[in-house]
């Protein structure tokens, strides 16, 4: 880079610095994540005030610094005002920003991640007002796509144990499938139960006294039994399997609780692979708990 450089980026995080400045974390197409000072941006009528806000997309001219770069010019090309007008949309967008901050690299182009985030923020903003569980569905869709871009796609079409295709059984209301975070996706519960019983049987046999110890033993490595993180019904599995599509399935408001389950599964899966909690998820929990109470 020269002493100054140009970049197009979206603001994902801002924190106060000194009396009137901000440090802004920006996802840029050209250079990935950068942290730069927005000088005087907290002053009244500062030209950088609004341009350093969350989810504002700017064309930037940035001066290189010893420890932190400095924004010298910013021209706004896109904003998402609709996100701030709806608590659910705002919480969902902050949730996505946290994931992106964990995934994005510095000093490397991140055009695909930049475009994907902006696309899903646009979809969230365009949702009709009052569709609270639509927000949850669109959030789950975005999280799945971000995980896929990072190479962390959960296995939702075939069983992690048997490698056989699993399709939802909509006829049997008691039908369930397991989801194992450690195994990386869905698990046929019949196969899982068979492994568990086999392991219990072997454990009992080992505890019995053996009169003669053979000179040699055959070591058999059994398939590890994964922990089941959640159990999904047919509707929830169907939703999960459709999240890989470019467009989200038609939202059925009668399946509100199912979207809650799908989001919870993806949240736990993302946190496991990112190695940290998603703090904005607490806002999602509070928002949907309040909306559920209001409709009961």
Swiss-Prot record:
Keywords: DNA damage, DNA recombination, DNA repair
SUPFAM superfamilies, A to Z: ArfGap/RecO-like zinc finger (SSF57863), Nucleic acid-binding proteins (SSF50249)
HAMAP family noted in UniProt: RecO
Organism classification: Bacteria, Bacillati, Cyanobacteriota, Cyanophyceae, Nostocales
Family indicated by similarity: Belongs to the RecO family.
Record organism: Trichormus variabilis (strain ATCC 29413 / PCC 7937)
Regions annotated as coiled coil: none
Any one annotated GO CC term: bacterial nucleoid
Function: Involved in DNA repair and RecF pathway recombination.
UniProt xrefs under NCBIfam families: reco
Alphabetical list of Pfam families matching this protein: RecO_C, RecO_N
Protein name: DNA repair protein RecO
Gene Ontology BP annotations: DNA recombination; double-strand break repair
């Amino acid at each position: 880079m020269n002493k100054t450089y140009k970049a197009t980026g979206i603001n994902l995080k801002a924190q106060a610095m000194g009396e009137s400045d901000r440090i802004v974390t920006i996802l840029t197409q050209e250079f990935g994540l950068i942290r730069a000072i927005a000088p005087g941006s907290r002053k009244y009528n500062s030209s950088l005030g609004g341009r350093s806000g969350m989810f504002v997309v700017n064309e930037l001219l940035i001066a290189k610094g010893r420890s932190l770069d400095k924004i010298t010019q910013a021209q706004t090309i896109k904003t998402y005002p609709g996100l701030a007008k709806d608590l659910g949309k705002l919480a969902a967008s902050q949730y996505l920003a946290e994931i992106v901050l964990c995934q994005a690299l510095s000093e490397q182009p991140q055009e695909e991640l930049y475009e994907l985030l902006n696309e899903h923020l646009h979809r969230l903003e365009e949702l009709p007002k009052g569709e609270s569980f639509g927000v949850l569905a669109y959030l789950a869709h975005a999280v799945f796509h971000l995980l896929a871009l990072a190479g962390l796609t959960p296995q939702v079409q075939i069983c992690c144990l048997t490698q056989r295709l699993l399709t939802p059984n909509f006829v049997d209301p008691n039908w369930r499938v397991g989801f194992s975070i450690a195994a990386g996706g869905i698990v046929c519960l019949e196969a899982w139960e068979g492994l568990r019983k086999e392991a219990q049987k072997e454990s009992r046999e080992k505890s019995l006294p053996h009169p003669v110890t053979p000179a040699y033993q055959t070591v058999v490595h059994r398939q590890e039994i994964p922990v089941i993180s959640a159990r999904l019904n047919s509707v929830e599995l169907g939703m999960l399997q459709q999240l890989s599509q470019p467009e989200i399935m038609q939202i059925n408001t009668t399946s509100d609780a199912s979207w809650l389950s799908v989001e919870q599964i993806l949240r736990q899966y993302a946190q496991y692979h990112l190695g940290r909690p998603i703090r904005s998820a607490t806002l999602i929990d509070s928002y949907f708990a309040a909306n559920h109470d209001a409709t009961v």
